[in-house]
Amino acid sequence: MSDSACIKNVKVTMLGGFSIAVDGHVLTDEANRSQKLWNVLSYLLVHRDRNVPQSEFIEQFWPGENSANPVNALKTMLYRVRAMLEPLFGSDVEPILSRRGSYSWNPDIVCTLDIDEFEALCHRANDGRLSDESRLALYRQAEQLYRGDFLPKLEGSLWVIPYSVEYHNLYLQMIKDYAALLEKKELFEEMTEVCTRASHLDSLDEQLYILIVRSLLRQGNDTAALAHYESATDLLYRNLGVRPSRELRELYSEIMSVEKSLETDLEAIQDDLRETAARPGAFVCEYGFFREAYRLEARRAVRSGT
């Protein structure tokens, strides 16, 4: 116990990748180890507040195998995990304990997990009793802490999936709450940056694009707002087969109403039209544009008698 107590600073990262740092020495999942080894270690750390029965490990990582081999395989795997951790903790410290057919993380070795920090920051930032400045500071910390989804290299493991979904959803909600506060404080540039980073982690969340387009409009950057609108609607249609929501279409109408720098150079317009005409495939456009184009074409047909 005294040896364990000498270890003061154990930090575990699981968002965006796995790492464990002990007093400045770091082990990451970039090391060439088996996926099952990282699974067992991560599972122990996530459930470090309890004893994990041997049967639970076998059910998670050796399902459907006969009774003898999984037990031996688990013992071998835990031996390898301990050997991997020894350079961090030393030979006198046992980070993993065995007792009565179960295994646990040594409770004397206190770990700080980024997932716990992230969750706590999100909940604190939602406290309406705090000042806007205090909440913004908490949101900024939470946003910086979320470097990616939960254990991405183990995303195919069944036990990882619910955690990954939980933290991903918590992250998205945090970003949207953060953006709402930034909009209230008229910090539109930061709002754009935050929501753009989030869109790189979830490229199919329409609400993020709504926030990006709106923040650009509030900065008077209607050209960039239109470009983001067009790329977002194209991306969502190609991947999900969905049309823009009413909220996004309303932003499009707002872009059109505030557009100041219309192209008036006839030669540039002709060049652009020639380039557009040369593109293969179907022409995807906003419904409002299609309606006006249809009406113009119908009137032309009436005039020409076709």
Model-predicted regions and their roles:
Residues 29-61, 81:
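Short amphipathic alpha-helical recognition elements used for nucleic-acid or partner binding
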Residues 267-287, 306:
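Amphipathic HAMP/coiled-coil signal-transducing linker helices
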Residues 2-13, 78-108, 237-246:
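DNA-binding patch around the recognition helix
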Residues 67, 102-267:
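Intrinsically disordered, charged and Pro/Gly-enriched terminal/linker segments
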Residues 284-304:
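Short regulatory alpha-helical coupling segments
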Residues 33-42, 67-89:
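DNA-recognition element of transcription regulators
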Residues 1-40, 94-102, 268-271:
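Short boundary/linker motifs that mark transitions into or out of structured domains
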